[in-house]
From Swiss-Prot:
This is DNA ligase. NAD(+) binds at D32, A33, E34, Y35, D36, S81, L82, E113, R136, E173, K290, K314. The active site is at K115 (n6-amp-lysine intermediate). DNA ligase that catalyzes the formation of phosphodiester linkages between 5'-phosphoryl and 3'-hydroxyl groups in double-stranded DNA using NAD as a coenzyme and as the energy source for the reaction. It is essential for DNA replication and repair of damaged DNA.
Length: 671
C-alpha cells in the first residue's frame, strides 16, 4: 500500500506541475494527450483505491452531485466595483485627482491590466488548499460555486511554493475564450440546446450550473487580479509584486500586465491593447489601471463602493441598441438565402453599423424578431454584426412580421429547405444572377484560380451585361470587351486578360476548390486531388469511394457525387479544359515508400504557427506522405496544435487522438 500511495503522490505532483506550466507559465512541456494519459492513470489508481483519494487531487475537479440551489457566502472583505472612464480626458482628470490627494508630490506608477469580460469570483485557500469559491453577487454576499470552480483546470486546487499564507482569498475573473464559446454554440445549434449571445453570458451560464459535471465540460479559464482576505502570511508591497507572487504559487495571471511610469505610458498601453483586442482570443472591454504602491493605495482610500486608486478605462461598447428598419434576403453562391437586418445606423465598438446578419429562419424565430423592433446589436472584433436579442419591453405597436420568401428574391425560382438543414436555398442554380455573381467571384478569388485584378465590381458588371454566364466564359473575354466596362481603360483591360491567361496554369486542388462544390473547402479539395489524382477518376467515383478520403463523410461525398452527376457542371468543366485550363500530372508516391513519421497518416493543423505558414506546413506534410484534413474525426491520426488552438484541439482530446505542438512537428519534419 505504501508504494501505491507514493505512486499517487508522484502522479498528482506531476499533473499539478504541468497544470502550472500550461495555465500560468504558458509554456507546456508535454502534449495535451500525455497530460490526458497521466490523468487517466491517476483516475484508474484512485478507482482501485478510493480510500486514498484526497480533496486536492486533480481528479476531484469533477465531483459533487447536482445542487438543488446555490447557498450563499458572505465576503469577509467586500468585492468592490470600479469607477469607469471612457476617454483620455476623463482618465487624465482621474490621474490628476490621484496626484493631488497624495502627499509630498510622490511619484505614482501604474499597474495596468486587461479588463476581462467574464465573471468576477473570489477563491479562498487555507494552508494552500482551495476550500471555497463565490461569485461577486452584490459585493457583500455571493453564491457558493466551489464545486464548479474546482472543475476549472486553470485554477489550482492546491498552491505550491514557499511562504503560502494560512488564509488567502484571491480575486479574479472566470471567462470563456472565443474558440470555446464558438464550440459551445456550435454544439447547441446541432443538438437544439441554448445558444449564448456572447462569451460572457456563456461563462456566467457555465459557472452557475447546479450540476458541476456540466461546468466541467465547458472550457472555462481564469486570471487572478487581486486579493481579499490575507491571514498568517505576507505579500509584497506593490500590486504588481503581488501578482507575480500569485504566479509563483500557481495562480494564472495575464501576461499582458504592464507597469507604466506615467499617464502617457498608460494611454499608450490602452491604445496598444485596443489595437491587439481582435487577436487576443477572448473578450475584454477595456483596461484596468491601478496605483501600484500599496502604501499609496491606503493613503487614497475608498469612496462609496469603489477605490480611489483604481479605474476601469472602457473601450467603446461592443453592444448597442437600435431599431430594425427592414429585413432583406441575400443569395449566396450555393443558393443559401440569408436574412439581413437593415438597421437605424448606430456606432458599435467605434464602427457605424447599419446591417446585421440574422443567419436563417430559425434564428428569426428564436429571437421573435419583427420589423420595427428595438434590438441589441453586438460587434466583436472582426465578427459580422449580429442581433443579440429583441427588447420586447419596448416593442412599438406598428411592428410587422418577417416573412421568409418562398421564391428567390433575385430570380424567382422556388426556395427549398432540406429536412435537417438550417439554411433555405434558391433552386435556380446558374440561372440565378446572384448565384452566378457569387460563384464567379469565388472562382477568381486568390485561393482559387487567383485572377489578379478581377474584383467584385468587374464581376458584377460582366454578369449584368450578360458577357459572362459560366466560369469558362471568363477565358473568352477580350481586352476590347472589357474596355467597355465602367472605369476600365485599355491598359487595365489588357492586364486582366493577361491575368486570366496566367491563371490557366493551376493545380488540381485549386481547380476543384474554384468549382465551388458545396462543403468542399481548400483542405477537402486538396484531399480529393491527392486521393484520386485525376479528374477522370474523381468524376467516376462512387459515394462509397469518396468517403475513403480523409475529411469526407456521407454529406460531402453526396455533394461531390451530385455535382459531377449534373450534366451542366460537366459541360462547364469541359469548356474550361478546352479554353486551356490545365495542371501538372500527379506524381503518385505510395506512403509505404516514404520513410517519414507522417507517411500514411491523416493529419489536422489547428491554431497559428510561428515558424512557417500554414500552407508551407501542409505542403511539407503532403511531401512526406501525410493526408492533411480540415477537420477532426475518428479518421484523424494526428493533430498539430499551434498557438490559440480551438475547437479542433478540444475535439481531438475528446476522441483521444494524438496531439503534438509546433516544436515537435518541426523536429519530426527535420528527422
Amino acid at each position: 500500500m505504501e508504494s501505491i500511495e507514493q505512486q499517487l503522490t508522484e502522479l498528482r505532483t506531476t499533473l499539478r506541475h504541468h497544470e502550472y506550466l500550461y495555465h500560468v507559465m504558458d509554456a507546456p512541456e508535454i502534449p495535451d494527450a500525455e497530460y490526458d494519459r497521466l490523468m487517466r492513470e491517476l483516475r484508474e489508481l484512485e478507482t482501485k483505491h478510493p480510500e486514498l483519494i484526497t480533496p486536492d487531487s486533480p481528479t476531484q475537479r469533477v465531483g459533487a452531485a447536482p445542487l438543488a440551489a446555490f447557498s450563499q457566502i458572505r465576503h469577509e472583505v467586500p468585492m468592490l466595483s470600479l469607477d469607469n472612464v471612457f476617454d483620455e480626458e476623463s482618465f487624465l482628470a482621474f490621474n490628476k485627482r490621484v496626484q493631488d490627494r497624495l502627499k509630498n508630490n510622490e511619484k505614482v506608477t501604474w499597474c495596468c491590466e486587461l479588463k476581462l469580460d467574464g465573471l468576477a469570483v473570489s477563491i479562498l485557500y487555507e494552508n494552500g488548499v482551495l476550500v471555497s469559491a463565490a461569485t461577486r453577487g452584490d459585493g457583500t454576499t455571493g453564491e457558493d460555486i466551489t464545486s464548479n470552480v474546482r472543475t476549472i483546470r486553470a485554477i489550482p486546487l492546491k498552491l505550491h511554493g514557499e511562504n503560502i499564507p494560512a488564509r488567502l482569498e484571491v480575486r479574479g475573473e472566470v471567462f470563456l475564450p472565443q474558440a470555446g464559446f464558438e464550440k459551445i454554440n456550435e454544439d447547441a445549434r446541432r443538438t437544439g440546446g441554448k445558444v449564448f449571445a456572447n462569451p460572457r453570458n456563456a461563462a456566467a451560464g457555465s459557472l452557475r450550473q447546479l450540476d458541476p459535471r456540466i461546468t466541467a465540460k465547458r472550457p472555462l479559464t481564469f486570471f487572478c487580479y487581486g486579493v481579499g482576505v490575507l491571514e498568517g502570511g505576507e505579500l509584497p508591497d506593490t500590486h504588481l509584486g503581488r501578482l507575480l507572487q500569485f504566479k509563483k504559487w500557481g495562480l494564472p495571471v495575464s501576461d499582458r500586465v504592464t507597469l507604466c511610469e506615467s499617464a502617457e505610458e498608460v494611454l499608450a498601453f490602452y491604445h496598444k491593447v485596443e489595437e491587439d483586442r481582435p487577436t487576443l482570443g477572448f473578450d475584454i472591454d477595456g483596461v484596468v489601471i491601478k496605483v501600484n504602491s500599496l502604501e499609496q493605495q491606503e493613503q487614497l482610500g475608498f469612496v462609496a463602493r469603489a477605490p480611489r486608486w483604481a479605474v476601469a478605462f472602457k473601450f467603446p461598447a461592443q453592444e448597442q441598441m437600435t431599431f430594425v428598419r427592414d429585413v432583406e434576403f441575400q443569395v449566396g453562391r450555393t443558393g443559401a438565402i440569408t436574412p439581413v437586418a437593415r438597421l437605424e445606423p448606430v456606432h458599435v465598438a467605434g464602427v457605424l453599423v447599419s446591417n446585421a446578419t440574422l443567419h436563417n429562419a430559425d434564428e428569426i424565430e428564436r429571437l421573435g424578431l419583427r420589423i420595427g423592433d428595438k434590438v441589441v446589436i453586438r460587434r466583436a472584433g472582426d465578427v459580422i454584426p449580429q442581433v443579440v436579442n429583441v427588447v420586447l419591453s419596448e416593442r412599438p405597436e406598428d411592428t410587422r412580421e418577417v416573412v421568409f420568401p418562398t421564391h428567390c428574391p433575385v430570380c424567382g425560382s422556388d426556395v427549398e429547405r432540406v429536412e435537417g438543414e438550417a439554411v433555405a436555398r434558391c433552386t435556380g442554380g446558374l440561372i440565378c444572377g446572384a448565384q452566378r455573381k457569387e460563384s464567379l467571384k469565388h472562382f477568381v478569388s486568390r485561393r482559387a484560380m487567383d485572377v489578379d485584378g478581377m474584383g467584385d465590381k468587374i464581376i458584377d458588371q460582366l454578369v449584368e451585361k450578360e458577357y459572362v454566364h459560366t466560369p469558362a466564359d471568363l477565358f473568352k473575354l477580350t481586352a476590347g470587351k472589357l474596355t467597355g466596362l465602367e472605369r476600365m481603360g485599355p491598359k487595365s483591360a489588357q492586364n486582366v486578360v493577361n491575368a486570366l491567361e496566367k491563371a490557366k496554369e493551376t493545380t488540381f486542388a485549386r481547380f476543384l476548390y474554384a468549382l465551388g462544390i458545396r462543403e468542399v473547402g481548400e483542405a477537402t479539395a486538396a484531399g480529393l486531388a491527392a486521393y484520386f489524382g485525376t479528374l477522370e477518376a474523381l468524376e467516376a467515383a462512387s459515394i462509397e469511394e469518396l468517403q475513403k478520403v480523409p475529411d469526407v463523410g456521407i454529406v460531402v461525398a453526396s455533394h461531390v457525387h451530385n455535382f459531377f452527376a449534373e450534366e451542366s457542371n460537366r459541360n462547364v468543366i469541359s469548356e474550361l479544359l478546352a479554353e486551356g485550363v490545365h495542371w501538372p500530372a500527379p506524381i503518385v508516391i505510395n506512403a509505404e515508400e516514404i520513410d517519414s513519421p507522417f507517411a500514411g497518416k491523416t493529419v489536422v493543423l489547428t491554431g497559428s504557427l510561428s515558424q512557417m505558414s500554414r500552407d508551407d506546413a501542409k505542403a511539407r506534410l503532403v511531401e512526406l506522405g501525410a493526408k492533411v484534413a480540415g477537420s477532426v474525426s475518428k479518421k484523424t491520426d494526428l493533430v498539430i496544435a499551434g498557438e490559440a488552438a480551438g475547437s479542433k484541439l478540444a475535439k481531438a482530446q475528446e476522441l483521444g487522438i494524438e496531439v503534438i505542438d509546433e516544436a515537435e512537428m518541426l523536429r519530426l519534419l527535420g528527422s
